[in-house]
Amino acid sequence: ETPQPVRWLLRDTFALGEASLLAAIGGAGKGMTLLDLGLAVAAGPEPGTEWAGQQVLGREVDATGTVVIIAAEDSQASIERRLHSLDADRRIRRRLGGRLIVVPLPNVGGAPCLFATVNGVHGPTPAWTGLGQRLRTIKDLVLVVFEPLAAFCSVPFDTEINAASAVTGAMAQLAADTGACVIVSHHMRK
């Protein structure tokens, strides 16, 4: 039996229904790149034009729909400046139709702990469960971004395999349940 082909969000890079990691040293532009991807995916093609040609990271965007970016370190003002630098004339943002949801956590009480260790067991918290339930209600969800991963975890995911497995397993389950691409960014040491 022939397997189903990969459904790409960003061709040959990020797949729908899968979890992915974007890792680089601090200051490399991960947040800006993910916001650029979110903007392109949420806006879709310009009316009257073909989708082909929309690119991020030199790859074609292959899906459109609702994008949720949960930004643990960027304030609303910072997000607005970044969006302005990507789309100064608002040509792209006028096409969003509410499909780009950016949650600037510094403005709403900070990042919730989504993964913790309880009685020696690493796993998701009730905050993760609640967030997952809300995300699963978005019918055309195609991209969820957690930026950066460390802000949401009190588990040692970068030094203990069991902690990493708990986090990646939960992210993969969210992607499988929603059909969206789930991307987490991670700061690597310089």
Question: Model-flagged regions — what are they?
Answer:
Residues L10, A52, E60-F157:
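Conserved inter-motif catalytic segment of the P-loop NTP-binding fold
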Residues G29-K30:
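Conserved glycine(s) of the Walker
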Residues G26:
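The conserved Walker
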Residues E1-L9:
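N-terminal pre-Walker A segment at the start of P-loop NTPase domains
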Residues A40-T64:
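Post-Walker A helix-loop "phosphate-sensing" segment adjacent to the P-loop in P-loop NTPases
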Residues G130-T137, A164-M188:
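Substrate-engagement module of ASCE P-loop NTPases
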